[in-house]
Amino acid sequence: GMDAEGMSEEKKQDLLNQMWRNPCLNDTYEPGSTFKIITMAAGLAEGVVSLNDSFYCPGYKLVEDRRIHCANRRGHGAQNFVKGAENSCNPVFIEVGLRLGTDKYYQYFRQFGLMEKTGIDLPGEAGTIMHQEENMGEVELATVSFGQSFQITPIRLAATVSSLINGGTQITPHFGVAIESSDGETVKALEYSNGRKILDGKISETVRYILEQVVE
């Protein structure tokens, strides 16, 4: 343990704050490959990619003057979109992001609620740190497409992905379902309204299908 004797009140308070900090809400991070689900849903919704579209991965993707590598430096070779998702192939998702373009990518980023806080019933939720749209070139778009060069909270990503696979209805995470008395009787059931529709149900079903292939 830590001896609090002789510690300033400010230091004590700082340590208490750190102890109660919830990184899922209070901290942002680069989501990485988990964010490919967002690019997938946007690409399918906009019709710029379909399940059997053909891709080729030589181990990198050239974007402007940059060679952006796949995690598999030897490359995945020829694959369709579903296989590209199974392989978590960076060049495939870069290509989908570039097909969407910056304007459309931002449109879906906002549509999927990623610029908003989730509204979870806990304090201190942090916001998304994203490129300004006007400063976003093809290289930035490429890196965002597979979850790098920007930051979001884990709870924001989890809420959005849940919404994209539940039929397309935006959810707000909550902790309580009911208030109960000490003997277990329900005093009050907590009801929450449904969120807005952020993705077509058929597209949501397709996203779910692809993700099932990834883990099978």
Predicted regions located by residue number:
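Beta-lactam-recognizing serine transpeptidase/beta-lactamase-like catalytic domain environment
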Residues: 1-33, 38-216
